[in-house]
Amino acid sequence: MIKLRLKRFGKKREASFRLVACNSTSRRDGRPLQELGFYNPRTKETRLDTEALRLRLSQGAQPTDAVRSLLEKGGLIEKTVRPAEVVGKAKQAEARKAGAKNVAKQAAEAKAEETPADNTEA
């Protein structure tokens, strides 16, 4: 399988990265199949070969998480909702529903407590 990943180069503590297409079993800094772009995290400079990237993505290349975020910022792929975000939103929705049910139960219990008290006094 072909992966789109970042290949590190530069001096110590001054890293820059090349965006490359390579086999998933190859080393991080091994020989790539194709160089597709450049990213410098210090200056936030990004250069992408959009035609080559679209071709590789259409062929089924899988980007790593870091590359995926660069491609999303570059507008080459749509932002995807990651499973953790989906689970978090689902749990939030369940908590809201459970909270609404608890509030309704408490209101019903409060009315039930008030009603028998009124009947015994009358």
From Swiss-Prot:
Any GO MF annotation of the entry: structural constituent of ribosome
Record region (Disordered): 87-122
One of the Pfam families matching this protein, by short name: Ribosomal_S16
UniProt keyword Ribonucleoprotein, yes or no: yes
NCBIfam families with a match to the protein in the record: S16
HAMAP family: Ribosomal_bS16
UniProt protein name: Small ribosomal subunit protein bS16
Organism per entry: Prochlorococcus marinus (strain MIT 9303)
